[in-house]
């Protein structure tokens, strides 16, 4: 007999707002020029050609993504200026996360195409995931659960404070 895996249920109060809200008809990375919605959209920083945004469903606390303003699905479609700004914002993300959470390492990556793991295929973005020794604890292994220790709003505020100290 095959074993049926059961989904663990955790209390995650920030998820209800997402679940009950109407689905976006636009790309989550096409943020436009309205900076008044940056906190709501978890935009941490706006560069000249790209921006830093928090992941609403993070692998770890502080999981950031860097995306170009232009809606393209592949790095090869970006200009040299856009590529340079993306990498500058990857570097800034690392600095912000070090200042805020003191991680011991980072995973930095791009998933291009569904088979490569891209959840959003048509707007390329780079993941910056802070890592600590032991952050892959027993919960995902035996309980199929990932524990994120603080609310996204708390993490957002910490990242913005660190950014203001760095810039």
Predicted regions and their residues:
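HIT superfamily nucleotide-processing domains
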Residues: 1-167
């Amino acid at each position: 007999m095959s074993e049926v895996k059961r989904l663990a249920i955790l209390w995650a109060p920030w998820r209800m707002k997402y679940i009950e809200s109407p689905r976006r008809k636009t790309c989550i990375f096409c943020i436009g020029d309205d900076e008044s919605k940056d906190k709501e959209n978890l935009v941490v920083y706006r560069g000249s050609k790209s921006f830093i945004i928090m992941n609403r469903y993070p692998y770890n606390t502080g999981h950031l993504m860097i995306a170009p303003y232009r809606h393209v699905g592949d790095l090869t479609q970006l200009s040299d200026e856009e590529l340079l700004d993306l990498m500058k914002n990857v570097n800034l993300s690392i600095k912000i996360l070090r200042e805020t959470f003191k991680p011991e390492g980072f995973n930095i990556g791009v998933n291009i195409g569904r088979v490569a793991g891209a959840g959003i295929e048509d707007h390329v973005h780079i993941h910056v995931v802070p890592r600590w020794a032991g952050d892959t604890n027993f919960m995902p292994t035996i309980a199929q659960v990932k524990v994120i220790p603080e609310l996204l709003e708390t993490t957002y505020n910490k990242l913005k404070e660190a950014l203001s100290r760095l810039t």
